[in-house]
């Protein structure tokens, strides 16, 4: 419609004025990674999801088993995801000095894969794992090798629904 078009043109002009000659801070969330195959929490047609909290994770061995089973199966989606034009555009804007830093809610590492250097990940990252017992940091491939050795019955190639945090809907105790 004409009013929507006018509003969009006005918004673009306002952004152009704001950005003229200045570097900006980019804030991103799950939406930037959906074109890379990583689902978001609240996209069209999605059922609202409530991620496991740290307290819930730490308070229950069953929650820990469920989390790691889902994460083990779903990790391949994140590991093989490629940056999309949005990630690449932000990396180019950073390299040219138009973006001075990126703050993201995402844990997928796609900004870094695109070439961005100054990225603050508010929710951490899934390619590194912190041991809550001793504080050691493991690479995700190292942890996956341990999980595979301890759980040879788990079928990573099963047809599953992938979720926003780089995990998958699976039932603990089933492969």
Label each residue range with its predicted role:
Residues 1-175:
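Conserved catalytic core of sirtuin-type NAD+-dependent deacylases
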């Amino acid at each position: 419609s004409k009013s929507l078009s006018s509003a969009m043109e006005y918004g673009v002009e306002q952004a152009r004025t704001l950005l003229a000659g200045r570097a900006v801070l980019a804030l991103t969330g799950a939406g930037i990674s959906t074109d890379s195959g990583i689902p978001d929490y609240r996209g069209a047609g999605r059922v609202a999801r409530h991620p496991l909290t740290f307290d819930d994770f730490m308070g229950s061995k069953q929650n820990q088993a469920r989390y790691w089973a889902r994460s083990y199966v779903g990790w391949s989606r994140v590991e093989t995801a490629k940056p999309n034009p949005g990630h690449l555009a932000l990396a180019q804007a950073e390299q040219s000095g138009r973006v001075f830093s990126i703050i993201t809610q995402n844990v997928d590492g796609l900004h870094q894969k695109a070439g961005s250097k100054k990225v603050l990940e508010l929710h951490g990252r899934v390619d590194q794992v912190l041991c809550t017992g001793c504080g050691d940091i493991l690479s995700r491939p190292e942890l996956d090798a341990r999980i595979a050795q301890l759980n040879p019955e788990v079928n990573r190639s099963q047809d599953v629904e992938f979720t926003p945090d780089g995990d998958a809907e699976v039932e603990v105790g089933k492969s």
